[in-house]
Amino acid sequence: MATIYIALVADVVASRGLPTAARARLQRRLLSAIPDFNRRWRKALAARFAVTLGDEFQCLLTSPAPIWEIAHVVRTTLGEVDWVIACGRGSLTTPLAAGRTAPELDGPCFHEARGALETAKRKHRLFGFGGFGAATTTLNAFASYYSALYWSWTPRQRRAAKLLRCGDPASVAAALKVSQSAVSHLARRMAWPLVSAGDSIFHAMLTDPHSPSAGPVS
């Protein structure tokens, strides 16, 4: 019997194109955010968040349930760049001891996540999935829809989308320094009710108890 986990790997889109000062600033902000991420999702973590490369980080989850929330908190907290969030489902080949961070571990779940990350980058997706059995194709189809919609928006609309996915209109208005009516107008132009409906289905695919999730398998 092997225990199945979800490895999550996040990386910045086109980070090498960032100016040196901007990339250094992002890396500092990421390092300062990691302790908050570990506190916020401590009950869902099999192994803690940690930075692997300069602007890439990993964590190991016991189930896929927090993926949606993690992705959108990251996109909002570190919203000056775009992030690819890749998830791989599988087992570990290294011992899992208390206090270990995700980059200290290895196994099929991480291989699946790494492959999903490379495919997502190649196909300009903001999500990538591997190892989820029959659900993998559907999850990546939703990732394609989500990403195509995002890239079709203007930079201002993209920022609004990040905020709307994590907050209410009042907080979005404060962040954008506009009125709530301006936020409503922007949301209408983005067909936000349809976007939200699509998001709900995508989210449900990740959290549905009947979908593949962490647990013992033979």
List PLM regions with ranges.
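Regulatory and interdomain segments flanking nucleotide-handling catalytic cores
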Residues: 1-218
